[in-house]
Amino acid sequence: MRISYTPESIEDLKRLRKFVEVKNTSAAQRIAISILKGVSQLKVFPYLGVEVQQAPNPEIVRDLIIGNYIARYLIRSNEINVLRVWHHKENRL
């Protein structure tokens, strides 16, 4: 299964990294790597995340919790689309 990132999720990752980087550059890099590794697990385990109950089709829209971060994604036939990424203390998207 292939993983793709929406433009919004790419901007989310950049924003999160930049926010942490101000205080701790190495932590920002570790967090970015951790999120990308977590998302890569979806290639093998696409249903790893929890269903997003408010989604029109919660079976295919899921949230993957990666430490303090959440990656929302959509499961398609041969592809995982990462929709958004945020810190759990941020307002939900």
What role is predicted for each listed range?
Residues M1-R2, L93:
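Absolute protein N-terminus
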Residues R2-I60:
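Basic, Lys/Arg-enriched alpha-helical interface segments
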Residues I66-L93:
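Enriched for short, Lys/Arg-rich terminal
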